[in-house]
């Protein structure tokens, strides 16, 4: 029996990739999503992120630009997209996430406007 937690990460920026690597190293099955097929192709081919020198992404971290693939059947879903994209991404992913027990929004920083 496989007790591995399946985690989908929406966002393939530095925060999404760092979380993917950390969660994978802790024994979880991780899939990372980006809306950019070119970015997914590059991440899959190089297993590195240009803004994270020296960090190698394990071969068993999965990449996709398909929202259904990243969200369907996951135990946990993390939104690691920029704040400006959260609403659009959530609306696009909505058909695939109604039964996921845990959904989180992760952020590196908050910006405030006056």
Regions found by a protein language model. Name each.
Residues 71-72, 76-114:
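Rossmann-like NAD(P)(H) cofactor-binding subdomain of soluble oxidoreductases
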Residues 68:
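Acidic phosphotransfer microenvironment of two-component signaling modules
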Residues 1-56, 61-65, 91-92:
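NAD(P)+-binding Rossmann beta1-loop-alpha1 motif at the extreme N-terminus of oxidoreductases
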């Amino acid at each position: 029996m496989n007790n591995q937690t399946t985690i989908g990460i929406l966002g393939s920026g530095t925060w999404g990739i760092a979380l993917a690597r950390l969660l994978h190293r802790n024994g979880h099955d991780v899939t990372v999503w980006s809306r950019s097929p070119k970015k997914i192709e590059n991440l899959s081919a190089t297993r590195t992120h240009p803004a994270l020198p020296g960090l190698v992404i394990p071969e068993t971290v999965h990449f996709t630009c398909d929202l259904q693939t990243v969200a369907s059947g996951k135990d946990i879903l993390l939104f690691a997209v920029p704040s400006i994209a959260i609403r659009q991404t959530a609306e696009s992913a909505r058909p695939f996430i109604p039964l996921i027990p845990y959904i989180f929004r992760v952020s590196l920083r908050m910006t405030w406007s006056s």
